[in-house]
Design a protein with these regions (language model features):
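Short polybasic amphipathic segments
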Residues: 6, 68-74, 91-98, 277-282, ...
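Conserved NTPase motor "head" modules and their coupling/switch loops across ABC/AAA+ ATPases, GTPases
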Residues: 1-31, 45, 174-319, 328-332, ...
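Structural recognition of the conserved hydrophobic beta-strand(s) that form the central parallel beta-sheet
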Residues: 72, 346-353
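Conserved lysine of the Walker
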Residues: 36
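Nucleotide-state sensing region of NTPase/ATPase domains
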Residues: 44-131, 135-147, 215-218, 247, ...
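A conserved P-loop NTPase coupling/switch region
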Residues: 107-111, 119-196
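Walker B catalytic acidic pair
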Residues: 323-325
């Protein structure tokens, strides 16, 4: 599988952009600030439905525009399909396949699988739990068709439940005579949905971690040395899911115990939004004991493990994205990731300096030239729009004169 052409409209810093890729290694070279990371991020969003750089769609849309569009021509096994997503600054994101009917973006997540390697990957080990949850969400979205929809539904339910808890906490918007009972009744309904969706998400995440564990341990040992033992440990907030065959009743009792605390704080105190994934090295938490080099290697092994699992489960080689990673790595790790990249169907690499371009056959794209070409196209479009507007104005005046 590979992307042959990518087009962006109003995506971050790109007003309009069209570029062609080839199978194998593609390198986007240009100084910082030209927008090369935005290009490969657009591929990540098309693939996974989200970006590792932001939790909101708003930053993905060029300022002053209501939406951004990403279109990709994808070739796989001799067939070509066109995937298009429309990212709304506010509201639902939509998608089309081959110009067909509009559908939710979540419905095409994973159809163009990709795995990204970025400078922020070390935070998968050293960063906060939200970083690791985002990784789990992207991984599960690639591997489990229903996951993206379940996550979206859970996020909505969690917001509704939190809003009711806040009402109970500060009394805002509650009718003195009847309102509190109505809020409590609503809270009971939302809590039931919160538990049902939360249990499913927890099970899905646990299954994904189970798929990743063996290749992660094996790949880390091959990169760092056979004597090093790395492992993944799921730390779910709903730990009842791991302890009971029917965890919903136990979780419901847990909510009853913490109800006063939730009302006092006005927020959901347990649930998948508080899950974590611990990376362990030699039976110790890596974020506390591993060196920077060991953290980099663990993050690299985790992404390589995800690639291996997606390849095996989906029977397709994901597109590999290497975003500005070579400047961050020593020669040994550069070699390891290049050996991995050269075996893949398509690799998109961003580099700032020409000296960072890896040796070997590659399709190199000059991002500065692409930016200049894009600006010329924007100017042509603006001029044409002005001409059309002037023509309409003249036509209108002529009609008025005749009448």
């Amino acid at each position: 599988m590979h992307i042959s052409r990518l087009a962006l409209d109003h995506y971050r810093s790109w007003d309009h952009c069209v570029l062609d890729f080839e199978p194998g290694i593609n390198i986007l070279q240009g100084s910082n600030g030209l927008g090369k990371t935005n290009i490969v991020e657009a591929v990540e969003v098309l693939s996974t439905g989200s970006s590792h750089r932001t939790s909101s769609s708003l930053p993905l849309v060029e300022k002053g525009h209501p939406s951004a569009t990403v279109r990709a021509n994808v070739e796989d096994a001799g067939e070509q399909r066109t995937y298009e997503i429309t990212i709304a600054a506010r509201g639902a994101n939509r998608a089309r396949v081959d110009g067909g009917k509009s559908q939710y973006m979540r419905d095409i997540v994973g159809l163009v699988p990709s795995v990204s390697f970025t400078p922020e990957d070390q935070r998968l080990v050293s960063g906060d739990p939200a970083t690791r949850r985002n990784f789990l969400n992207q991984a599960a979205s690639l591997l489990l068709p229903r996951y993206a929809q379940s996550l979206q539904q859970f996020t909505h339910v969690a917001k509704q439940r939190a809003a009711l808890l806040k009402q109970l906490s500060d009394g805002s918007g509650i009718d003195p005579e009847y309102g509190r009972q109505a809020v409590l009744s609503g809270l009971e309904v939302w809590t039931g949905q919160f538990i049902a969706l939360g249990v499913q998400l927890t099970k899905d995440r646990n299954n994904v971690i189970g798929l990743l564990r063996e290749p992660f341990t094996r790949i880390y040992a091959s990169l760092a040395g056979e004597e090093e033992q790395a492992d993944l440990v799921h730390e779910p907030s709903f730990d009842e899911v791991l302890l009971f065959d029917e965890p919903a009743a136990e979780i419901s009792r847990h909510f009853q115990r913490i109800y006063p605390g939730e009302v006092a704080r006005g927020q959901n105190l347990i649930g998948p939004q508080r899950d974590d994934l611990t990376l362990r090295l030699n039976d110790m938490p890596a974020r506390e004991f591993a060196s920077n080099g060991e953290m980099w290697t663990m993050a690299l092994a985790l992404k390589m493990a995800l690639y291996e699992v997606v390849s095996a489960q989906r029977d397709v080689k994901p597109i590999v994205i290497l975003d500005d990673v070579f400047a961050q790595l020593d020669e040994s790790r550069r070699g390891q990731i290049l050996d991995f990249a050269r075996r893949q169907d398509q690799v998109l690499i961003t580099v700032a300096a020409a000296s960072d371009i890896p040796q070997g056959k590659a399709h190199v794209i000059d991002v500065a030239a692409l930016r200049a070409q894009s600006q010329e196209t924007d100017g042509d479009i603006a001029a044409m729009a002005a001409m059309l507007a002037a023509g309409r104005g003249a036509q209108s005046q002529g009609i008025e004169a005749e009448s």
